[in-house]
């Protein structure tokens, strides 16, 4: 156990030991100890006050005192008062710090703080942080605040159980707060409010003071509006937190510049938010992802995927964002949504697939094509299931087709076209597009199914086609 010596105090111990000795028995938490009260009174004002003898005609040579200190910490302080030496290790340092603060023994206070800062442990950071606030220990407070902010996800339960409004605010307003996105902070504040049953006023103040609303998803914004009971959210112009700040994005940067960075990425959308996932950056496949709100014209952070991806496909389902296949791991699947701590790996596909067509009906995810130019297999994943299953095969191979659900049917269109009906579990052929296409897109405009883009035989297709559900055929769209 490390020993720390107060050399200045040691020089005075001999003189103190020559003074008249008065024995005092101190009842502490967990035991009692007999001390020389004369020496202990010289140590700090606390002991002068608490060990003072009451005046009586016949003084008892031994007095009894009760102190609200644990016996182990008190013993260490008593030994220090006799010898000028204090024994500190990671097991006793926190309790000894608290006891020395209560007893005003400054040498032990600063020795304990220096020991904690030099050999910092996660297991006592929360308690030290709260002592830093309670007793105004600025260096301890600053160090523990930064540590908790950086290890926020690991310490979340301890924070909820122990922190009041002020303790919480200092952490959540930090640029160093390590969170995957800003929605996570909103969800955390709500959990803290429910668990601790705090006053609603504290919840409102926290939301207004710590949330960086310009990086919230629509889901996060709706949660804030619900809490604040308002239709418009407050404006915040703070910089993004370091944990979700993109190193390749300069601030500020417009949406077009961000989209250009995500070259050859996978894209999908939920409402007004478009998700850009993976692709090719700096001559390599990467695992970055970002969301762009084209209504509010701001970007929303997304944590990096578990795997880099190129030629993958994305689909929203089960209130999550799924990314399927692609290089370099064409059978891998993972999912995430705003407020989640990280992407979660999902069951692998039965076949490797690149740029497969994906769609979701009733939260069942369907994957078609992307395996080979002759493959007609399909796969599906039921909600809360841990394995993909083969579905009914398509009539044609759909190596570079696209899929979209329209009118309760799953349309699969590329060089050929067909649709899937979930109730009958069958595929039905429809007329092929007028212009066969690789990698086109299906969109819905004014309740019409439109086929746009794509290329064929190294030429891009600029003609838009509209589906006629009466004739099961395609027509050139005139914009009406």
From Swiss-Prot:
Top-level taxon of the source organism = Viruses
The residue ranges of the BACK domain are: 125-223
| Cysteines engaged in disulfide bonds, as pairs | none
- BTB domain location is 10-90
What conditions trigger expression of this protein? Answer: Expressed in the early phase of the viral replicative cycle.
Pfam families the UniProt entry points to: BACK, BTB, Kelch_1
Asked if the Swiss-Prot or TrEMBL record annotates the protein with the keyword Repeat, the reply is yes
- Keywords, comma-separated and alphabetical: Early protein, Kelch repeat, Repeat
**Ranges for the Kelch repeats:** 273-319, 320-363, 365-408, 410-447, 448-480
Family that this chain belongs to: Belongs to the orthopoxvirus OPG047 family.
Q: Which PANTHER family match?
A: KELCH PROTEIN, RING FINGER DOMAIN AND KELCH REPEAT-CONTAINING PROTEIN DDB_G0271372
Q: What does this protein do?
A: Might have a role in the suppression of host immune response.
Q: What is this protein called?
A: Immune evasion protein OPG047
According to its UniProt entry, this protein's organism is: Vaccinia virus (strain Western Reserve) (VACV)
Q: Which gene encodes it?
A: OPG047
